[in-house]
Amino acid sequence: MTKTIAINAGSSSLKWQLYLMPEEKVLAKGLIERIGLKDSISTVKFDGRSEQQILDIENHTQAVKILLDDLIRFDIIKAYDEITGVGHRVVAGGEYFKESTVVEGDVLEKVEELSLLAPLHNPANAAGVRAFKELLPDITSVVVFDTSFHTSMPEKAYRYPLPTKYYTENKVRKYGAHGTSHQFVAGEAAKLLGRPLEDLKLITCHIGNGGSITAVKAGKSVDTSMGFTPLGGIMMGTRTGDIDPAIIPYLMQYTEDFNTPEDISRVLNRESGLLGVSANSSDMRDIEAAVAEGNHEASLAYEMYVDRIQKHIGQYLAVLNGADAIVFTAGVGENAESFRRDVISGISWFGCDVDDEKNVFGVTGDISTEAAKIRVLVIPTDEELVIARDVERLKK
């Protein structure tokens, strides 16, 4: 038995989960928030307890030190060396990383070079790797990429209709994201349906503050909604998703909001989506509350959000030539029952239908009516478990 920790490092946060492997038992989990800010918050959950402390954490290395010390303080481990492996979520692996990889040689430098493809994510992911390397230099460190699952896409799906030189020289293509989540829920869907994954055609919908939809055939990603970066695809909490590219030069010419590449990235990544249209919030709970109060902008934002998701599901029904199941996962997909109902009701012609008695808050499993030809499933994602499994597989 070994102890493996799965890490998801954000720019100001560090989410973690400690496993006993190969039993896949969660020993503890937690979240460190507001790294680099005053009054950082560290939360540790274990044995039915939740312990929280507020302190100032300047950087990721200090955050990791506090995490490890908390594990000892709460008698979850006796010493640092009980942890024999650490796995890190990394958003962008480009064409260079086609699978999870042990951190050695120039691996970390390559991860940082790929920050161009995920500027909001890869730098923070790399900071988490460096922090653990500094404090636990001798354990196996593994990077697990959101993009790896999508390397099975055919060229017709991942290439853009731009001059070929931009692909060959600049690697401009669709990479996708959330691959670890899509891979996990596809496998769980096969178990739930009682059929081999190799026999299934699935449309997996990872809908959280960020969101992506993937067409999965025989366990392989054949197309996905996110593109060159996690900005592409469906409308999201603060991201536009797909828009007409000509909007950008137009706004550069006629407004003062788009003067630099940083301006463009800020507006498209942080100020758009549900937040931009509603002028209220990027959180679906806030949007639904505003809709209930009759707020027009929130209602429009919600309708646009559902519309873009329906269109992508329809697109992937065409790509797959039908589907056995549509799977909802992540924060919104798992918890917003009215959202699931509204998405499916608009595409019922394809043979999918939700049973309102099954489609309730907190439900998991099959929420379809008995007569539905395409099953509708709700499956909680577990990206951390996939990461822990990959660490165990790659340990020397």
Swiss-Prot record:
Lipid metabolism: is it a keyword of this entry?
no
Q: Which InterPro entries match?
A: Ac/propionate_kinase, Aliphatic_acid_kin_short-chain, Aliphatic_acid_kinase_CS, ATPase_NBD
- Residues binding ATP, per UniProt: 15, 206-210, 283-285, 331-335
Instruction: List the subcellular locations.
Output: Cytoplasm
Q: Which domain of life is it from?
A: Bacteria
Q: Does the keyword rRNA processing apply?
A: no
Q: Which reaction is catalysed here?
A: acetate + ATP = acetyl phosphate + ADP
For this chain's UniProt record, which GO biological process terms are given?
acetate metabolic process; acetyl-CoA biosynthetic process
* Cofactor binding note from Swiss-Prot or TrEMBL: Mg(2+). Can also accept Mn(2+).
Q: Which residues bind substrate?
A: 89
Q: Which UniProt keywords apply?
A: ATP-binding, Cytoplasm, Kinase, Magnesium, Metal-binding, Nucleotide-binding, Transferase
Q: Where is this site: Transition state stabilizer?
A: 178, 239
UniProt-recorded Gene Ontology molecular function terms? acetate kinase activity; ATP binding; magnesium ion binding
Question: What CDD domains does its record include?
Answer: ASKHA_NBD_AcK_PK
Q: Residues that bind Mg(2+), according to the entry?
A: 8, 383
Cross-referenced Pfam families, in alphabetical order?
Acetate_kinase
Assigned EC number: 2.7.2.1
The record's GO CC annotations read: cytoplasm
Q: In which pathway does it act?
A: Metabolic intermediate biosynthesis; acetyl-CoA biosynthesis; acetyl-CoA from acetate: step 1/2
Q: Where is the active site?
A: 146
Per its UniProt record, the required cofactor names are: Mg(2+); Mn(2+)
Summary of the function given for this chain in its UniProt record? Catalyzes the formation of acetyl phosphate from acetate and ATP. Can also catalyze the reverse reaction.
Question: Quaternary arrangement and interactors, per the entry?
Answer: Homodimer.
Query: What protein family does this chain belong to?
Result: Belongs to the acetokinase family.
Protein known as: Acetate kinase
List the source organism: Streptococcus pneumoniae serotype 19F (strain G54)
